[in-house]
Amino acid sequence: MQHEHIYFSVRMRAAQGGSHEQGGKHISGGEKIVPYHDLSSCMAELAEKGLNHSRGKPDFMNIQFEQIEEAVKYVSPLPVGTHVVSSVADGQATARSLLTEAGIKPQVIEEAYYVLSELTELRGALFIDAATGQRLDDPIKNGVRVTRMDWPLDDFSCWLNEHQLSPNIRMKEALALATKVTQHPATIAELCWSDDPDYITGYVASQKFGYQRISQLKELGEEKGCRIFFVDQTKMKNLDAYINYLTTQPVLIRWKQEVMADESRSMAGRAAE
C-alpha cells in the first residue's frame, strides 16, 4: 500500500481533572492533516503542545489519527488585516463594527454576547442565527469543535515571507480554521478570541473582508475564550449538514500553488498578446 499519497487526520485534546466528557477543564487541542511519513513527528508535536500549555498541566490526553477517505478540498487563505487597539473596550468595539460590516444586525451581535456571557466555559463554536440571534447548536454539547483542516508549514512559510510577517503558529492554526469555516456559504462571520490566558489577540473573519486580527479582545490572564459563528440558515441544507462540513470535510490551505497558477495564467496571457 502506498501511504505517501494518502492523508491522515490527527487530533489531540488535553484536559485537567479527567476527560472532557467527565467535566475536566479543557487545557489544549490541536488539528493536523499529514501524510503517513509525518504521523510520528506530528503526534509528538501535538503531545508537546498539550503537555506544556499556559492553561495548566493535563491529567488526560487523547491523540488519535485516521486515514482520510474523503476528497481533500484545497483553498486559498483569507486575506489578512490587522487592527491595533489600546484596550479591550476598543478591541471589542472594533469587533462589533466588523461584524456589522459583515452584515450582522446590532441586536443580533448583542444577543450573541449575552449568550456567551451566560457560559462558564466553551469547548467549541456557538452557532448564532444571523436573522434572529437565537442559539442554534446543542447547549448540552457546549459548542461544536471544527476539525480536519491544516496549512502545510512550507506553504505557510512562503506566505509569511511574501507578507513580511514573523513566524506565528497561532495565526497559522487560526487562519486555517477561519478559512475553512467561512468557505461554507452559510457562515456570514466568525468572532474568536483564545482561551489561553497569555494570548489576548482575536479576530473577526468573513468572506466579505477576510481575516481581521484585533490586537486585544480580552485582558491578560483571562481564560474564557470565544468562538461564535453567525450563520444564515437559508444557505444550508440543514444544521446537521453544516456541522458535518465543519467536522468531517478535510480542508488544506494552499497559497503558494495559487500564486504560481496566477503567475502562469498571467504569463500565458502576455504570450498571447
From Swiss-Prot:
GO MF: 6-carboxyhexanoate-CoA ligase activity; ATP binding; magnesium ion binding
Cofactor: Mg(2+)
InterPro entries the UniProt entry points to: BioW (IPR005499)
Chemical reaction(s) catalysed: heptanedioate + ATP + CoA = 6-carboxyhexanoyl-CoA + AMP + diphosphate
Pathway: Metabolic intermediate metabolism; pimeloyl-CoA biosynthesis; pimeloyl-CoA from pimelate: step 1/1
Keywords carried by this UniProt record: ATP-binding, Biotin biosynthesis, Ligase, Magnesium, Nucleotide-binding
EC number assigned by the record: 6.2.1.14
Function (record text): Catalyzes the transformation of pimelate into pimeloyl-CoA with concomitant hydrolysis of ATP to AMP.
Record family assignment: Belongs to the BioW family.
NCBIfam families in alphabetical order: bioW, PRK01322.1
Subunit comment: Homodimer.
Stated name of the protein: 6-carboxyhexanoate--CoA ligase
Organism, scientific name: Alkalihalophilus pseudofirmus (strain ATCC BAA-2126 / JCM 17055 / OF4) (Bacillus pseudofirmus)
Organism lineage string: Bacteria, Bacillati, Bacillota, Bacilli, Bacillales
